[in-house]
Design a protein with these regions (language model features):
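A conserved beta-strand/loop capping segment in the N-terminal third of enzymes
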Residues: 1-3, 32-37
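Active-site substrate-recognition segment that forms the wall
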Residues: 79-81, 85-87, 96-193
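A general structural signal for well-ordered alpha-helical segments in protein cores
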Residues: 6, 58, 180-184
């Protein structure tokens, strides 16, 4: 099983000071009573933590950036060039902007930005899949990893989020419905309620 296969990794983490407790099937049921009683054992990251609202964290970081004098502009960047005064010229769909320093968060779309200070990077997309189960966050007390299935299920403010499968598919590929169906079927099997 995957727990046996992960023993080297678990030992490495423990050797690095990560507190991990081995737990039995009974202990899993005590910690997470809504899980189907099919797990022979597992591990618990004793000091583990998670966000229940990742969007709120990003909003707070953005606000902190603005409070420190930054400017947040949501626009499509087309070009980025050096100017003779040492500033950067950012060409967008609606206008050109000038700044000493910029942060452009374009992810895989970065390859579509032209300009003299753009280094070509062979970047492709890693598309992640997740399924949300609204109003079901109460079913888990903490994130639960399902190593055999390659998924994590996390309780968030707006429901349970199950994620873990990815693919290299490019920017224009259509979503793979089989991956979404797989995630949903695994979650329904381990959380039958």
């Amino acid at each position: 099983n995957s727990l046996s296969a992960a023993q080297d990794d678990i030992k490495r983490r423990r050797d690095q000071g990560v507190p991990i407790t081995d737990i039995t099937s009974r202990e899993i049921q005590e910690l997470e009573p809504h899980l189907a009683p099919t797990f022979p054992g597992g591990i618990l990251f004793d000091d583990g933590f998670h966000l229940t609202n990742p969007k709120a964290l990003i909003q707070r970081l953005t606000q902190s950036f603005i409070d420190d004098g930054g400017q947040f502009i949501h626009n499509k960047v087309c070009s980025l060039n050096n100017m003779s005064n040492g500033h950067l010229k950012v060409g967008t769909h609606t206008n050109d902007l000038e700044a000493k320093r910029v942060i452009i968060a374009a992810g895989a779309w970065s390859t579509q930005i032209s300009g003299g200070c753009i280094d070509p990077v062979p970047l492709d997309t890693e598309r992640g899949y997740h399924v949300m189960f609204p109003n079901d966050a109460r079913l888990l007390n903490r994130p639960v990893g399902l190593a055999d299935a390659g998924l994590y299920i996390s309780p968030l403010d707006d429901g349970l989020r199950a994620a873990g499968t990815v693919e290299l598919a490019g920017l224009r590929a259509r979503p793979n419905q089989r991956r979404l169906n797989y995630i949903e079927s695994v979650v329904r099997r381990v959380l039958p309620e």
